[in-house]
Amino acid sequence: MKPLHLKLNNFGPFLKEEIDFSKIDNNELFLISGKTGSGKTMIFDAMTYALFGKASTEQREENDLRSHFADGKQPMSVTFEFQLNHRIYKVHRQGPYIKEGNTTKTNAKFDVFEMVDGKYEIRESKVISGTQFIIELLGVNADQFRQLFILPQGEFKRFLISNSREKQGILRTLFDSEKFEAIREILKEEVKKEKAQIENRYQQIDLLWQEIESFDDDNIKGLLEVATQQIDKLIENIPLLQARSKEILASVNESKETAIKEFEIIEKKTLENNILKDNINQLNKNKIDFVQLKEQQPEIEGIEAKLKLLQDITNLLNYIENREKIETKIANSKKDISKTNNKILNLDCDKRNIDKEKKMLEENGDLIESKISFIDKTRVLFNDINKYQQSYLNIERLRTEGEQLGDELNDLIKGLETVEDSIGNNQSDYEKIIELNNTITNINNEINIIKENEKAKAELDKLLGSKQELENQINEETSILKNLEIKLDRYDKTKLDLNDKESFISEIKSAVNIGDQCPICGNEIQDLGHHIDFDSIAKRQNEIKEIEANIHAIKSNIAVHNSEIKFVNEKISNINIKTQSDFSLEVLNKRLLENENALNNQRDLNKFIEQMKEEKDNLTLQIHNKQLRLNKNESELKLCRDLITEFETLSKYNNITNFEVDYKKYVQDVNQHQELSKEIEDKLMQLSQRKLIEQNNLNHYENQLETYNNDLELNEQSIEMEMSRLNLTDDNDIDEIIAWRGEQEELEQKRDTYKKRYHEFEMEIARLESLTKDKELLDSDKLKDEYELKKGKMNTLIDEYSAVHYQCQNNINKTQSIVSHINYLNQELKDQQEIFQLAEIVSGKNNKNLTLENFVLIYYLDQIIAQANLRLATMSDNRYQLIRREAVSHGLSGLEIDVFDLHSNKSRHISSLSGGETFQSSLALALGLSEIVQQQSGGISLESIFIDEGFGTLDQETLETALDTLLNLKSTGRMVGIISHVSELKNRIPLVLEVKSDQYQSSTRFKRN
């Protein structure tokens, strides 16, 4: 990442500033120079804030970055253009703020652009997604950016002096090693889950084994007595258990099948006897019902005769009904003809009345034409009538307002002259404020040094007292330790190993006699008495253990005290008593008060002058605004006069209200005349159309009447022919037959029902006679008793078989589950053994007592130190090398850095280095860190680096060496920028970015020495 252009608005001391980094030729080394507080570090803050929304140092919050002199209505913003991998990007970030006059905060904004074909195209326009885009683009977050690109003031030696836990946090962020810690936790949880699953499987096997049914069988009970932890024995017994269960099931099944066959035989015999009994009863009943049905035969024959006559007269009845319909149509047609003739007469009367109205309307035509002409000529005036009416209303107001504006303008001019006289030749003196501020700062620094020295001396006395007390304790404990060691050496340790052999010797003595051969040494036994005092041996052994425990406790205490003394020595070496002023605190406080009073007086004077200038600017602005309003008033007055003249010329009216009333009246008269004329024409057209329709209807009705008369004549002829065919003489005969038609459906149903039942009886009697022929009926009660007996026996055996079958199948399922659990358990124990071992190694239970994450971080730290030593050797004239402290204690140590002094051939604590040596080591380590991170990340492009302060602690020769190191970075294609107050750097570095301040804002410019 290489900076190209930086634009700052209301950022720190920069109200509106631009820095063009393209003026730096060929990645030239350049110096950022300026007075204390001028805003040099703010340049780094601006670049970091533009990219990540944070300052270059963690101590600065976003609210601290906004300029105190910024306009309350203007936001703080930074625009940063940079080059990355031969592509150009621009970011614009606006900070959140509460706009003057508002109570709610204006939200932050962030836009990311990329240059494509010479133009910037937007890539992101939201704060969160845009910041994530930048992190992915650069390959680093804000913390990593501070470590790689910007080495902030007071922070870039932090990595050198930090302890293992602090380095772990830094390296974890840079190399994303948290994933290794996550792996350890995952493995830990996985092992925990696996062990729980294994225990659960043992419980499931035991539960299944206890639930297996024994059928009260001695063989199965014997097989089930095996303990479930003996999984191999379970595997052997399961086939035997299944085979015995099948034998029990087969025996029960054989008894069940025999009972089912016996029941089926008696069930079939009972069913056949019941069917035969029902058929005999049904046959007797059907024969009786059939005799009763035959008695209805004469009545059915009479019904059939009536139905035949009704069928023959159907055509005649249809002709009679048709005659009535035709006569009705003829009567309706005559009525329609009469109504239509009356409608035609009424329409002719209406037309004559409308013709009279039309003639009266045409007599007013000339007057209407004159009104139309007036409307056409003045329509444009009426459409914009408000404009002309407003001109009449505004003209007097505008005259009065113009006179008032002229008077106010004269008063403002006089006020401006008064303010200019008050200012006179007075000017703000900010240089004096700067001088007083510097003096006050120096006095405060001297006061703080005196107070810090007093505090440091008190702390030093306290630490020296603690150290002396610890040394006295060590001497006292060392003396006690020597006495205990002397006492321990005096003890006789022989035969102590026989203390636990007393029972063994007693057993041997009880098994042998005097004169026997000893089973231990092979010699003849002369005596069986007691030769060893076991009580004395045990007492001596307890005393030795007590002394050894005391020695161990004292050694532990001495080690703790030595560690505490080492810690106190480190704190003593870190106490720094600075050179202080010769003046007393009383004198310094008096001088401080005098300078603060002088500063306040000068600030009050500057504030008064600035207020007068602000009032002058305000009056100038008011005069300008008044002049604009006066010009606007004159323009509006002229426009009103022109509009009034135009209205009176065209309308011949000098009153807007009269014109509006007459115009609307004329428009109303014209509209009424036109609407009435159109209405008359529409009525005439409608009357003509209606008369034509009624004439057509009349012709249609007359044609219909003629057709109906012809149909009636033909229908009468058909009636006469049909009566002749049926031998009917008059209408009375026809009426009698017609009376039967109401009963026709009932008669037909009665006839059909009789025939259907007659046929059914014949069929059913024949069927039942065939079923009962040559068959004997048995005793039903005896059959029922035998049926119930066989059924009860069968159901009992079926229930027994179902229960045994279910239990056998359940046993099979349980044994299969047990086998499955055992197989899975064996395989699981085999598969998870490697995971158990891996989890212990990753958790630090290994020969180095290191967790996986710390092992990886130590590897990266070794790479960083090796890279840093290449530069440190040059800067320290081959005296110093950084080394990693090898002490390791279960995972969280091993990351401390010491320095190896080649002159003394010994390693030293990093705090023993001088300020200049510490700067050399910090710079070398920071450069090594950035290069290793770049190598590991791959996607990070380090084309620039910026360093803030630190060179003031170096002597001339070391300063030259450090500069040569930074110049070598330039040769690798990296832009290097340095912030420093060291004057020698201005002579060595030709290009300087100078930062100047006038106490309320700063500016920058590049210059060459």
From Swiss-Prot:
Residues binding ATP: G34, K35, T36, G37, S38, G39, K40, T41
CDD domains: ABC_sbcCD
Protein family per UniProt: Belongs to the SMC family. SbcC subfamily.
Induction: Induced by ciprofloxacin or mitomycin C in subinhibitory concentration.
Identification of the protein by name: Nuclease SbcCD subunit C
Record keywords: ATP-binding, Coiled coil, DNA damage, DNA recombination, DNA repair, DNA replication, Endonuclease, Exonuclease, Hydrolase, Nuclease, Nucleotide-binding, SOS response
SUPFAM superfamilies: P-loop containing nucleoside triphosphate hydrolases, Rad50 coiled-coil Zn hook
Single GO term (MF): ATP hydrolysis activity
Function: SbcCD cleaves DNA hairpin structures. These structures can inhibit DNA replication and are intermediates in certain DNA recombination reactions. The complex acts as a 3'->5' double strand exonuclease that can open hairpins. It also has a 5' single-strand endonuclease activity. Is involved in the repression of type 5 capsule production by down-regulating cap5 genes via the arl-mgr pathway. Is probably part of the SOS regulon and involved in DNA recombination and repair.
Gene giving rise to this polypeptide: sbcC
InterPro entries: P-loop_NTPase (IPR027417), Rad50/SbcC_AAA (IPR038729), SbcCD_Nuclease_C (IPR053380)
Keyword match Coiled coil: yes
A biological process term (GO) from this entry: SOS response
